[in-house]
């Protein structure tokens, strides 16, 4: 049963309503920042162990630096190596066959430094779970690549559509390629004024569009947002019209710009140095991020984390629609610019805003999630020989959620 929330209309359209009138009045400059999603950025780094006394390339003179071509394009890696040699010509570079060996060689002091694409940091975590906190970058290079428009556009004011929302596990630039840590399907029917928010666990075992093999859904983001959208479209058996993407910086910045949020915590637990108590709790950006990421504290970790992500998003929605924020939301709009992107066009967004202003309609929304069973197994597309945690989809859950999405699209 859909729950009626008066004029609180859903995560997506509420955000648009809060920001929309300001966007229109201030022109398209901020909106263009959000909708200009035509590039992706790969962040390469030469890293050493954090305990190392090495802090610059000049301290690696005549030493060998290992890198891996297991997933990267040789052309891009050669470009990065050439840039590093311009900085320090005496550097030598050797190839390691796998990311697993690359990490082991660094930790075993076989080499003092390795060159990596940080999108693949998760590949090291099987053997070195705290990899990201145990290394430091001493040199970096970013490669930007043009991305073709992969949206399937419709007339958003009178045709049902789907938006995929991705939360990537990085800080900094929103265009950085990384794993997709949060995965939500937003199904919108502008005719019936219904919205369905469906979450999918990051470790869901699905066929990746680029690899044609199964792996955890989060790894689809390594090849860019277009690959995750294709993967999800194939899994759902329907078009995904648009996508929107946020990262850790986005969440922290947006929550803090809102002056914090009030979350209805469902159980006592601790995570990330923060303590959460049953009941309503005020959270700042970092507290909200830790709350929405934690899974190890719970027996049903992945499913609980998905619910907490929805809790945080709904708390943000409620705060956005409060009179205190509505009368002072230019700071929120400024915060969003640069840490949120979508391939919806500016005209699509303004059309939705104008529709809502004109009809002042009440919307209904429903929250659902795909479920499954957690297993430890080998065979994933990216790390086939490593025994990793995956969530095997529950067939009944898949059928139920696919039908729910179809029902909203079909006006039921």
What are the roles of these predicted feature ranges?
Residues 10-17, 64, 83-84:
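N-terminus-biased targeting/localization segments
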Residues 32-42, 48-50, 57, 61, ...:
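Non-catalytic, solvent-exposed segments at the cell envelope interface
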Residues 11-32:
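Transmembrane alpha-helices and immediately adjacent membrane-cytoplasm interface residues
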Residues 2-5:
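Conserved small/polar residues in nucleotide/adenosyl-binding loops
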